[in-house]
Curated annotation (Swiss-Prot):
UniProt-annotated site: Basic residue of the functional dyad, residues: K27
Record's keyword terms, sorted: Calcium-activated potassium channel impairing toxin, Disulfide bond, Ion channel impairing toxin, Neurotoxin, Potassium channel impairing toxin, Secreted, Toxin
Domain notes for this protein: Has the structural arrangement of an alpha-helix connected to antiparallel beta-sheets by disulfide bonds (CS-alpha/beta).
Phylogenetic classification of the source organism: Eukaryota, Metazoa, Ecdysozoa, Arthropoda, Chelicerata
Protein origin, superkingdom: Eukaryota
Name used for this protein in its record: Potassium channel toxin alpha-KTx 1.11
Transmembrane segments: none
Cellular component GO terms, alphabetical: extracellular region
SS bond list: C7-C28, C13-C33, C17-C35
Principal location: secreted
């Protein structure tokens, strides 16, 4: 699931994914965060 968070590296997505979905797994794809939910 993509969220509207800009990123350059995957670890920048972990906290936003945790906040949005309660899971700290995700990666940066195409400058946007994708959370694995």
């Amino acid at each position: 699931t993509f969220i509207d968070v800009d990123c350059t590296v995957s670890k920048e997505c972990w906290a936003p994914c945790k906040a949005a979905f309660g899971v700290d797994r995700g990666k940066c794809m195409g400058k946007k965060c994708k959370c694995y939910v």
